[in-house]
């Protein structure tokens, strides 16, 4: 077993095997099994070529814990992650070119998710399961297409303050607002179908008092 540390998280590589091809025109076979100390497993099985770099592999992520990554969320939203795990099952491709090409096709899910408003220390967003089925992502040109999004038992809190501001406005981190203004590039997002099961919302309009 080999243990490495990346982004302050420890990874244990249970298996990392590259089967070299004698025919240099053919890519090598790749198989990898990575266990995360914070919870979760990443598996790869496919092809690898080193010059130029090319990866063509099946990607499977099982029960990847989100809480250890909460510091990255704060750069986007003023939320504290309380729980949540990610599961991914699909096909990943990358090829090194003048403009690098990358794509993913498969299913992505987040389960047992809960996040609190940092300022109020109240539950802001939660769900039992959120699954993106038939997700297609590509790097160049950047786009995301999803056949269906299924949300089971989602919850959110919507509060209108006395000054008529909405609590959603206060969640976005100032750094994220600045980056949004400076970044003119947009990413097309298309979702064919959304299904919500047993959702709930806490709503209050304090501007009426």
Q: Model-found features: residue ranges?
A:
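Flexible beta-edge/linker motif
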Residues: 1, 57, 82, 91-107, ...
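Elongated, acidic membrane-bridging lipid-handling scaffolds
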Residues: 1-73, 94-96, 101, 175-209
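Membrane-embedded beta-strand positions in outer-membrane beta-barrel channels/transporters
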Residues: 15, 41-43, 87-89, 129-134
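Outer-membrane beta-barrel domain signature
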Residues: 21, 33, 77-81, 121
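Extracellular/lumenal and peripheral-membrane lipid-interaction modules
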Residues: 61-92, 149
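A generic secondary-structure boundary signal that marks alpha-helix termini
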Residues: 78, 139, 204-205
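Short amphipathic alpha-helical linker/capping segments at the junctions of internal repeats
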Residues: 128, 169-176
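Acidic/polar low-complexity surface segments
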Residues: 164-167
């Amino acid at each position: 077993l080999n243990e490495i540390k990346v982004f302050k998280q420890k990874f244990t590589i249970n298996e990392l095997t590259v089967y070299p091809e004698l025919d240099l025109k053919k890519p090598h076979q790749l198989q990898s099994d990575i266990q995360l100390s914070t919870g979760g497993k990443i598996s790869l099985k496919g092809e690898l070529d080193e010059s130029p770099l090319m990866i063509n592999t099946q990607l499977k992520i099982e029960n990847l814990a989100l809480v250890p990554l909460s510091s990255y969320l704060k750069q986007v939203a003023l939320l504290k992650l309380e729980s949540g795990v990610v599961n991914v099952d699909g096909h990943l491709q990358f090829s090194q070119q003048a403009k690098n090409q990358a794509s993913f096709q498969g299913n992505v899910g987040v389960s047992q998710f809960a996040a609190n408003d940092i300022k109020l220390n109240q539950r802001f967003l939660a769900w039992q399961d959120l699954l993106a089925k038939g997700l297609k992502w590509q790097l160049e040109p950047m786009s995301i297409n999803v056949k269906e999004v299924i949300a089971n038992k989602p919850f959110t809190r919507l509060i209108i303050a006395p000054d008529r501001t909405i609590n959603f406005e206060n969640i976005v981190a100032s750094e994220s607002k600045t980056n949004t203004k400076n970044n003119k590039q947009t990413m097309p997002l298309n979702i064919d179908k959304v299904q919500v099961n047993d959702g709930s919302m806490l709503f209050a309009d304090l501007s009426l008092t």
